[in-house]
């Protein structure tokens, strides 16, 4: 890790990062999230994602455990997920 990366990131890379994704109640939500993450982290498998409905059932929440190598990769995953039509929020 370069000195510049140390100054701009509190995350130590490489690491397994838990992405929290909220989105539409849709039968393809889980698969869409997984496929989007795999564009930037191809080693992500189906067992790395868990989903659950929101308390009122209006949304679906997903947590994806993603192995990321650097901040750029993580940023690319965030951008890809937030631009997906089924995704509302990514944390």
From Swiss-Prot:
It comes from the Bacteria. InterPro entries: UPF0250_YbeD-like, YbeD-like_sf. SUPFAM superfamilies: YbeD/HP0495-like. Belongs to the UPF0250 family. This is UPF0250 protein NGO_0791. It comes from Neisseria gonorrhoeae (strain ATCC 700825 / FA 1090).
